[in-house]
Every structure is written in C-alpha cells, then in structure tokens.
Amino acid sequence: MPQKDPILQVFEKAQAERQNWEALWQDIAELVLPRRDFTVDRTKGSERQSRIFDATAQSANSMLAAGLQQFMVNPQSKWFQLRVPGIENEGQDRDAAQWLAQVRDLMLAEFNAPETNFYPTVHEGFMDVTAFGTMSFFLASDENGRPMFQSRPLPEAFIQENARGKVDTYFRKYTMNNRQATQEFGTEAMRQSRALSRELDKGDLSKEHEYVQAVMPNSYFDATKHQITSNKPWMSVHILNEADKPRMRFSGFDSFPFIVSRWSKMTGETYGRGPAMQVLPDIRMLQEMSKTVIKSAQKVVDPPLQVPDDGFLNPIRMHPGGLNYKRTGTNEQIEPIITNGRVDVGIDMIRDRQAAVQQAFML
C-alpha cells in the first residue's frame, strides 16, 4: 500500500480541525451571506434564500463591509503612508519625504489599476470577515510582474498557525476541469495520474477533479542556493486529491502570499469570530418572527372563511364580482373567521430584533 503524501496528512488534520466550525458557518451563510456554502453542495444558479424572511442581517453585513472598505481602503483617498524604519520623523528630511510620497503614489496607482483586482478582492474579504470572522486573499504577480490579487473565500481555506499565533500554513481546496488543469499544470503533470491520463485520451476535458494547494514554511530552504527557483522560504505544492494523488506542481514564494485576517479571536482558536456570530440568535429569531407575522397578516387581509354546511355542494366564487347563491329564507352566509391576532405587536417585536442586529453590525 503506497504511503500517503505527508502534506496531505497535514491537510487532513487541518480539515478535521475546521469541521467544528462548518455547521456554524453554514447557518450564518444561509441567513447572512447566501452565496457561501460549507456543508451543502448546491448547483450553480440555484435559489439560496429560502430561509430568509427578513433580510436585515444580509443588508447589515453588506453595509458594514462597504463601510470598512470606504474607511480603510478608499480608492479616492491616499489611505496609507510610508515610513523608513528607525527614522522618527522623515519630515525633517525633505528629499526623503518627497521620495516616500512618490513611491506611495506609485503604489496607489497599482492598487487602483483594474488589472490588479484589488478593490473587488478586498470587498469579498470584508464580506467574509464581517459574516464569519475570517477573511483571506492571495497576492501574486502576473506575467508582467504586476501585483495581482485574488479572492480566496472561506469555504476553500484551511489555515494553521505558528507558535506566535500567526497564520503560516494555508491549504486551498478547489476544483478544476481537465481543460483548466492542463492549462495550469501541463500535459506531463496530468499524465502522472492514470485516471486523468485515461480521460485525456478519451478527450474528456469537462470532467472536474478536486485539488489541494499547500503553502507552508519550507524546512529545506537554503539561502545560499538562490539560483534554484524552487528553493524559497515558502513552498507551494498542488496535489490531485483523488485516486493516486500525484503532485502536480512544486514551487515557492519569497514571502507568505496569503493575507489572512480575523475579526476577533478567542484564545486557542484558529479561526475568527465576527459580528454575525455575536448576534446569530437574534438573526434566527427574526426569521421565525417574520414568518409568523406574515402568516398573521395574511389571516387579517385574507382571512379563513366560515361556510354554511351545504356550501360544499355549491361552488364558492371568491374572485371580484363573483356570484354566490344562498337558500331563500335562511340567514346563512359566508363569513370570515376573525382571529384577533395582534400583528402590530409582532411588528414591534421585529423592530426590536432588527435594531439589535443593526447595532451588532455597527449601523
């Protein structure tokens, strides 16, 4: 029996550690950020808001994410400054201050360039961190050496920390079809797997498979061997997570390429906790209360009817202008059943819960 890849063994441990979070995240996703899934595999384009009767939490999460982006990384402002370590006041050196300002402006121009995809990526990250408490995105370089940011949504991210509590190991679980994988890894790498090789021979390019990318500290890094491209402080390995599990590509990075942020973090926990977790009971209650009030309002607007016992013999026409015949000499008639439900009380209670949710999201 072939020995399991040690990197996949570490990944399976990270996967097991994250399982405790996934049911909670799925609940939050269905009520706050329906485009995410953790324990449910839904088809693309399917309806995802069947549990939502009150969208207060969904709107509050979007507004907080937009507010964070506007406040922290506003593309219309110069939202960061550069300093030289060890120098208290660069303003005393006019040339140094001018040079730092020029470099900052060049960096801002790169961030603002559509090709870098920075602002859409950051927005997706803020949506995750306010809902689930953890966000991550990937920083790399394109073929021209320009920075390129890519969103890494939480469903595909598995993280581990070092002794200082800083994330230094990142696993990304993703799927690609054979056409995409061949473009990414090359035919030779694809031929390492007997299953993939057979599918390529058949021309089956649409079949999807699961892959794992592992980025972690390279224990074999040698700073004296800088001419070797794979000799980097951080190693990156892509592995087919099916069948014979070959390594599709081995490379590395000079610095950790993932930016991982946690909203708040409890001692001993790896993943963060966000505003949605804090107010999740109120979010759940809002859905039940809204559903009940909707039913109560329907009974007031379109109440159940009390029909004479012979009504089943004659058709009852409820549409405007409908004619219903009654027996001559009787007082029997169709009457609404008044339930005396207090819809106004339900609405007041809903407003209280809505205010609590909005307060948790700092609105």
Which residue ranges define each predicted feature?
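Extended, helix-rich architectural segments
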Residues: 1-206
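N-terminal start-of-chain detector that recognizes signal peptides
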Residues: 51-53, 106-112, 184-185, 205-209, ...
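Generic structural hydrophobic/aromatic packing signal, biased to beta-strands
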Residues: 107, 137, 157, 214, ...
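Short, flexible beta-strand-to-coil junctions
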Residues: 138-144, 215-224, 239-244
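Short, ordered beta-strand-loop transition motifs
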Residues: 141-144, 162-165, 220-231, 328
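Membrane-proximal cytosolic interface modules of multi-pass membrane proteins
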Residues: 206-213, 217-218
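Extended, charged amphipathic alpha-helical segments
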Residues: 227, 231-363
